Amino acid sequence: MSFNTFGHIFRVTTWGESHGPALGATVDGCPPGIAIDAEAIQHWLDRRKPGQNRFTTQRQEPDAVRILSGTFEGRSTGTPIQLMIENTDQRSKDYGEIAQSFRPGHADITYHWKYGLRDYRGGGRSSARETAARVAAGGIARAALSELVPDLRIEGYMVQIGPHAIDRSRIDRAEIERNPFWCPDPDTAALWSDYLDGLRKAHDSVGAIVEIRASGVPAGLGAPIYGKLDSDLAAAMMTINAVKGVEIGEGMAAACLTGSENADEIRMGARGPEFLSNHAGGILGGISTGQDVVVRFAVKPTSSILTPRRSITTDGREVEVVTKGRHDPCVGIRAVPVGEAMMACVLLDHLLLDRGQTGGLRGPIGEA
């Protein structure tokens, strides 16, 4: 197995390299009859594409998606959907000086160890450019979810860049689309702007924390032990380039709480059981509770920087490496739409799994 595919029923295979002629995704398992609109998929891709502001790489890629198969008269046929995005702004010459050197923090050395050769142009398959294909596939998942679970909403935003976190008391979700950071706190967005400008001038980069929230998720998605919804979400987020940690709900902070603080109490409401808090992040025992599913992931600083770094060459010589080219000072910014796409793919996959196993049946609560 080459491990380029994820999912159980809704399966996504991505292909292509950063400086190849194209990249894309093959989406298998999409239910038939779903309205598939290339313009809607393009909307999600436009949110991720590079070169939109000074805080992301200046590589100018239109990321125009083409649907090559799997649809007829605007609807899915149930057969594999092939999505292709052409690369149009490669500058492979920027990488000529490091063809024989391993860039610190990159997958250069591990790819070389494993395969005996590597595409040094922008990292090849290990480049974050690959995530464009995931966002396109996520557009298919969103289209299916919008028909199968109309009230489900997925929203991603940045909660921290470097040491600077948002003030959650000031969260205004209307602000998320109004700044280049997907930041729900306008005061923090202004702080991040100045902070990143300073890092860019210093030829450095920084990490970030992204939060993805899904509301309207039906209760009952996921399965015990080895089919947990949260384990699949964590695995999906960990596959995103530069992600080094994932947490669900309170996550690591739950270690600082007592049992009486952390356990979400339950009461009967007008429409059934209601949780009084959501420390669990919408998942208990691997199964969704019907509350918001909340996932956060930490993104490491961009490893490609203009500051000289010590490394070695393929023949063992010690050198200093300066990575030229066009790179994000904070790759976490463009990871927001990628995290949303992965959330959509996993939720649709588990919705289809649940319908196949239980038919959507639910145990009654509060009925005489």
From Swiss-Prot:
Pathway given in the UniProt record: Metabolic intermediate biosynthesis; chorismate biosynthesis; chorismate from D-erythrose 4-phosphate and phosphoenolpyruvate: step 7/7
GO BP, sorted A to Z: amino acid biosynthetic process; aromatic amino acid family biosynthetic process; chorismate biosynthetic process
UniProt cross-references to CDD domains, sorted A to Z: Chorismate_synthase
One GO location term (cellular component): cytosol
Family (UniProt): Belongs to the chorismate synthase family.
Reported cofactor(s): FMNH2
Keywords tagged on the record: Amino-acid biosynthesis, Aromatic amino acid biosynthesis, FAD, Flavoprotein, FMN, Lyase, NADP
Record gene name: aroC
The keyword NADP is annotated on this UniProt entry: yes
This protein's name: Chorismate synthase
One Pfam family here: Chorismate_synt
Catalytically driven reaction(s): 5-O-(1-carboxyvinyl)-3-phosphoshikimate = chorismate + phosphate
Binding residue positions for FMN: 125-127, 241-242, 285, 300-304, 326
GO molecular function, one term: chorismate synthase activity
Subunit structure: Homotetramer.
EC numbers, comma separated: 4.2.3.5
Binding residue positions for NADP(+): 48, 54
PROSITE patterns, per the entry: CHORISMATE_SYNTHASE_1, CHORISMATE_SYNTHASE_3
Annotated cofactor note: Reduced FMN (FMNH(2)).
Function comment: This reaction introduces a second double bond into the aromatic ring system.
Residue stretches in coiled coil: none
